[in-house]
């Protein structure tokens, strides 16, 4: 953890008073499970807390930044900023991927590169920072790490493919659009979902993701990229 502390101090002017709290933020459940006798804490509770403060601060930022955007647009933009892939990217930017404690099996299976694990660790770090410092320090960190990319327009370019597909298909009237899970693979804490999108019972696209919502977006994207002619 000393290397992590150095990174935090040199790049973000952050020094944790409670080093155990910082270590917990970077401890995956797989590591804690492999060391049960030591009663090591994992980062899921901190992730819960970090998710809440992240949602609050990003919501506040978007509310003030875009006074004319309707609630629906703000919600979509926030969802893109705090989604799994985005948070994993921020974690990599901060070099957090190097410091996550994983179980041997998780490490061997490529867990250090998984967006779910990286995104969760990023949120857990925010939760730990909130407890060790205060919400102002979390806000300072978010504005240093995340907001520059938001203001650069990186997340405006991401398309909500489910909404886009619905708009394309319903231009001439309502049609029945349904998403269904084809398969689920992987351990309970890191599942991969395969989803297909159906229009009037006909499969028009398939997608894969670490959550059902992400898989649905990928399926909708697949359908949009095929073109409407193949959808109806």
Swiss-Prot record:
It is an enzyme of class 3 (hydrolase). Its main location: cytoplasm. Residues 5-134 form the RNase III domain. Gene3D superfamilies: 3.30.160.20, Ribonuclease III domain (1.10.1520.10). SUPFAM superfamilies: dsRNA-binding domain-like, RNase III domain-like. It comes from the Bacteria. InterPro entries: dsRBD_dom (IPR014720), RNase_III (IPR011907), RNase_III_dom (IPR000999), RNase_III_sf (IPR036389). GO terms for cellular component: cytoplasm. Signal peptide: none annotated. The active site is at 51, 123. It holds the Pfam family Ribonucleas_3_3. Keywords: Cytoplasm, Endonuclease, Hydrolase, Magnesium, Metal-binding, mRNA processing, Nuclease, RNA-binding, rRNA processing, rRNA-binding, tRNA processing. Its cofactor is Mg(2+). Belongs to the ribonuclease III family. This is Ribonuclease 3. It comes from Streptococcus pneumoniae (strain Hungary19A-6).
């Amino acid at each position: 953890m000393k290397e992590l502390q150095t990174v935090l101090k040199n790049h973000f002017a952050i020094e944790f008073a409670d080093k155990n709290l910082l270590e917990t933020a970077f401890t995956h459940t797989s590591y804690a499970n492999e060391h049960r006798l030591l009663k090591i804490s994992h980062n899921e509770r901190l992730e819960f807390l970090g998710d809440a403060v992240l949602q609050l601060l990003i919501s506040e930022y978007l509310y003030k930044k875009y006074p004319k955007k309707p609630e629906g647009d703000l919600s979509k933009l926030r969802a893109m900023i705090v989604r799994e892939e985005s948070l994993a990217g921020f974690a990599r930017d901060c070099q957090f991927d190097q410091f996550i404690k994983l179980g041997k099996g998780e490490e061997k299976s490529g867990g250090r590169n998984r967006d779910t694990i990286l995104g969760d660790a990023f949120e857990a770090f925010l939760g730990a920072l909130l407890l060790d410092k205060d919400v102002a320090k979390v806000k300072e960190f978010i504005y240093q790490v995340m907001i520059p990319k938001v203001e650069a327009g990186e997340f405006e370019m991401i398309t909500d493919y489910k909404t886009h597909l619905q708009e394309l298909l319903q231009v001439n009237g309502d049609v029945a659009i349904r998403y269904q899970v084809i398969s689920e693979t992987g351990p309970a804490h890191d599942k991969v979902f395969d989803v297909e999108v159906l229009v009037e019972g006909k499969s028009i696209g398939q997608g894969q993701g670490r959550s059902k919502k992400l898989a649905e977006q990928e399926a909708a994207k697949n359908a949009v990229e095929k073109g409407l002619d193949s959808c109806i």
